[in-house]
Swiss-Prot record:
PROSITE patterns: MANNITOL_DHGENASE. This is Mannitol-1-phosphate 5-dehydrogenase. Keywords: NAD, Oxidoreductase. GO terms for cellular component: cytosol. NAD(+) binds at residues 3-14. Its EC number is 1.1.1.17. The lineage of its organism: Bacteria, Bacillati, Bacillota, Bacilli, Bacillales. Belongs to the mannitol dehydrogenase family. It comes from Staphylococcus haemolyticus (strain JCSC1435). It comes from the Bacteria. Pfam families: Mannitol_dh, Mannitol_dh_C. It catalyses: D-mannitol 1-phosphate + NAD(+) = beta-D-fructose 6-phosphate + NADH + H(+). InterPro entries: 6-PGluconate_DH-like_C_sf, 6PGD_dom2, Mannitol_1_phos_5_DH, Mannitol_DH, Mannitol_DH_C, Mannitol_DH_CS, Mannitol_DH_N, NAD(P)-bd_dom_sf.
Amino acid sequence: MKAVHFGAGNIGRGFIGYILSDNNIDVTFADVNEEIINALDNEGAYNVILANEEKTTTRVTGVSAINSGQLSDELKQAILEADIITTAVGVNILPIIAKSFAPVLKEKENHVNIVACENAIMATDTLKEAILDITGPLGDNIHFANSAVDRIVPLQKNDNILDVMVEPFFEWVVEKDAWYGEELEHIKYVDDLTPYIERKLLTVNTGHALLAYAGRFYGRDTVLDAVKDEAIVADLRQVLGETSEYIVDNFSFTKEEQAAYVEKIIGRFENPYLSDEVTRVGRGTIRKIGPKDRIIKPLSYLYENNLRRKGLLKAAALLLKYDDMNDKETIEMREYIDAHGVKAFLQEYAKINDRLADEIVAVYEDL
C-alpha cells in the first residue's frame, strides 16, 4: 500500500507517518518546507524517539518526500497511486492543501481513504468540503473518514533535523463505516467518533490549556513546571472533574472509565521527559475561548444545568489574563479587552449570555 501524508512536521513524522510505516505502507511526505523535504529525500529515513527513561528509538525507513507548493507531475503521480491520503497541517491550512491535489482525485481509478488528522472536530469534513468545492461530485472510490488523534509532540531541537521525540501514549480513532478496505494496526475503528473527539478535547486539551494559562499567570515557564505546583494541580483536577460531568452525562463512558482516563491524562502531563513551554500550549486564545472549544463548551453546559463550574470559571478567567505578546490572537484579545472590557470580549468571542459572562468576570477580577 502507498500513502501520501501532507505535513512533514513533528506530528506528521512522529505520529501519522510512523503509524503508517509500521503498517508496511510506503509513505510519501508532502510539504512546502524545502529543508525537511530535501532531508527526507536524501536520507529516506528518520528516528522516532519515545520520551521515556530509555529514550526508546524506532527507525522509520522507506519514506520519500515531495514539495506540495504546487501540483507537480511527481505529486500528481503520488496521489494517483495512493491508497491513503492523510494530513497534519492545521485545520486552517486544509483548504490550501486541497488545491494542491483535489483535481487529481477526478482521475483516480483505485480506492483511497482520505483522513485529516488535525486537532479539530470532524476535520475531514472540512477537507472534504474544500475538495468538493474544487472538483464537484467525486466517484465512489473516494472515501472520506473523520478521525480523532492524540499524541503530545513538544517543540524540540534535535541534532538531526528529521528525528522527532514523542510521548509513548497515542490514540488514533477513525470512523469505521467511512473507511474502505483493510483496517490498519494501531488505529481504533469506531461506529461513532464524537464521544472520542469530545473526550479528548475536554480532557487533554482543556487540561493542557489550564496548565498553560495557570502556569503563565503564576510564573511557570513549562507545562512540567506547572504540573509540579500543587495549587495548579488542584485547579487541574477540579477542571477535569467538571468536564467529566459533561462527558459522562452526554456519552456512554461510565464515571469509572472517565476517572481512569483522567488519571492517564494527568500522568501524561507529569512525564518528566516531555515538556512544552506554556507559551506554545497557550497560544491561540481567541480560538480557545470559542463557544465550541475546550473551556466554554463544557462551561456553558454546566451553567445551563446548574452544575458545579468553579474550576472552568477560573480556567476562562486565566485565559483572559494570558499575556503573551508574541501570539497574534492574544494581542488581539488584549487590545479588545483594553478598548471594550472583559464582558464585551466574552460576548463577542465566546458568544455567552450576560449572566455567565458576569460569573467569569467576577473570577477574573478576583485573580
